[in-house]
């Protein structure tokens, strides 16, 4: 215990956004020090037993869909929570070590991890135990919408109601925040991954071709749009896939309209969650939100025109936060500082 405390003196306090698609780590006075895909490549023996970790993060993501039989590239997080405990722990261990690469001692940091608002107690305990197993000496949990709101510079400590929509890789969190607490929250298991899956299904159905996750993600980023207005440029992209009928590679052209048609269902799920939040929040908070608007955070906020879609469907102004991808990790870092100043009970529902 004493040795762990001594190691702690040589470790940074970390805010970790442990996401389905990416893991970000924020360090006080240094900012975002790590932004890596939440992917681990593992070596297996002939019966499928784990032998060793082959790669983590960017290097492992490059292996998705390209590995030999002896190596499997997996995502240990699903829908914002742990799907593979052992691999998540190894991934966290690797990332924490990366952040402390100059240290001569094994790191033992104080860690704050951001969790989905809809995570169960069992899922929260798994995240906490995984962080401790990865070397953390002390672990705090904070709900992602609260961290996102702090990172987006919303006035979370005042009585004014602030609404945040955090669209991550696995989940979309919709929350109303006031007086350092979440007064309304809902979490739908729809995010960037669902958009990618919808594009893969659409290509298979419409063009009879198979594409992988990395290609679907590239399509979404390059020509994807949540709403097409009159006068908008219709982007096109040549896509290479594997034709099912011919059993050979084939190229075809996709447009922004195709992508919009493909992702319509997950978009409808996010719109429905936002409408429900506006219907169910307290009248005074609703008035604040209609006056001040809703704030979009997370990687999903980068999907072209998603702010326009949500504004048109809800009748409320929508603002995309500055640097939406890092809002949760940065907000978690600020939350750690608030805990130091006011104690762990400042976010009584989360910590």
UniProtKB/Swiss-Prot annotation:
It is found in: Cytoplasm. GO terms for cellular component: cytoplasm. ATP binds at residues 20-22, 169-171, 217-220, 299-302. GO terms for biological process: cell morphogenesis; regulation of cell shape. SUPFAM superfamilies: Actin-like ATPase domain. Keywords: ATP-binding, Cell shape, Cytoplasm, Nucleotide-binding. One of its GO terms (molecular function) is ATP binding. CDD domains: ASKHA_NBD_MreB-like. Forms membrane-associated dynamic filaments that are essential for cell shape determination. Acts by regulating cell wall synthesis and cell elongation, and thus cell shape. A feedback loop between cell geometry and MreB localization may maintain elongated cell shape by targeting cell wall growth to regions of negative cell wall curvature. This is Cell shape-determining protein MreB.
